[in-house]
Amino acid sequence: SMTSTNLWGDQKAAVAYRIDPSSFLGEHRVPEIPYAIYMILGYDFTGFHVRFRDISRGGVRVILSNDENYVHNRQTQFQENFNLAFTQKLKNKDIPESGSKGTVLMKQGKNDKANLAFSQYVDSIMDICLKAPGVPESDKEEVIFLGPDENTAHLMDGACNYVHDRHYGYWRAFTTGKSNKLGGIPHDTYGMTTRSVRQFVEGTQRKLNLKEKECTKLITGGPDGDLGSNEILLSKEKIVGVVDGSG
């Protein structure tokens, strides 16, 4: 069932629905029922946001399609979003925040509107969090945090500043991946994600009595992103190949 919406607001940038997941996921085979699901419908995009606890964090990615894969992306968007959020929940097991994930699927031929779509995605979610005019009143506080992902890393500062302008109480923490001047920590500079992954690799090597310098490996993902580039810098294995779709 729908628990909140900005449908009746007269200044909405997109229509957002907050949905009780137990009302429709209970009969399906999912590993766990999320805490909340948002569905956001914009002129040029369809968006979702799934979180597994009231306080959760995870990235939001913009999905850009070509003529060949748009239908597939549209049909699998929610399932992919759910899987990403559940995976983020597992990743966040050792920190106070649970996991969440968001996706913004651009409609066919509308990839050039991606930045605007992300802004509208944030704006419509804020309508519900801030109980904008036309949004049903609720005694329960709604808290949303976002992070960078595919095609959104450059938008974190703007999102942080925007929710500040809308007087969101948690604006400083609203996005990760923002610039230092807004309180962000450059995780790529410190290799934060890579160092976490390396613990699994090194733990496996210890368990199997393998010496790091004697191991060979093939990297998929490549040096273009912060994870692959820092993996190359931090590791001592012999790299025999790198596959990077971005070139």
Where are these regions (language model features)?
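N-terminal ligand-binding/catalytic initiation module
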Residues: 1-187
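Glycine-rich phosphate/diphosphate-binding loop of Rossmann-like nucleotide-binding domains
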Residues: 179-247
